[in-house]
A protein has these predicted regions:
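Aromatic-capped interface at the extracytoplasmic side
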Residues: 1-13
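Short polybasic amphipathic segments
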Residues: 9-12, 31-33, 50-53
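Short acidic-glycine loop/turn motifs at beta-strand connectors
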Residues: 15, 47-49, 91
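Short extracytoplasmic
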Residues: 15-43
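N-terminal post-signal-peptidase region of extra-cytosolic proteins
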Residues: 30-33, 37, 58-67
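Glycine- and acidic-residue-biased ligand/ion/polar-headgroup-sensing regions
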Residues: 40-42, 46-56, 81
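Local cysteine-cluster metal-coordination motifs and their immediate loop/turn environment
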Residues: 59, 64-65, 74-82
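Non-cytosolic head/periplasmic domains of membrane-anchored proteins
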Residues: 76-97
Length: 97
């Protein structure tokens, strides 16, 4: 890492508070982890340069159906769990000097 052009990461927020940052969305490292809150549990998967909610115990499953996100500015929201996943980082236009 270290400021490569187009580098991106993901931030996970619960109820508006940053609770986890994923600094490597590298395609060769697929893995999953659980985010457990007082409102429920979401299983987050990282891989293929993307991040997504693979399993959630919320009622509407909108976050699961949202699919993979991989571009700066994209978000996945689980409203029942008050969880937001956001891709942050430079776009190619931002990296031009």
């Amino acid at each position: 890492t270290g400021g490569k052009s187009g580098e991106k990461s993901a931030e996970i927020y619960e109820n508006g508070k940053l609770i986890k940052t994923i600094s490597d969305l590298s395609p060769d490292k697929e893995y999953s982890f659980d985010i457990k809150t007082e409102n429920g549990t979401n299983t987050i998967t990282v891989g293929e340069g993307s991040i997504w909610v693979s399993v959630a115990d919320c009622s509407n499953q909108t976050c699961v159906h949202a699919g993979k996100i991989s571009h700066a500015g994209q978000t996945v929201i689980c409203a029942p769990h008050k969880l937001v996943i956001k891709i942050v980082g430079e776009t190619s236009a931002d990296a031009v000097i």
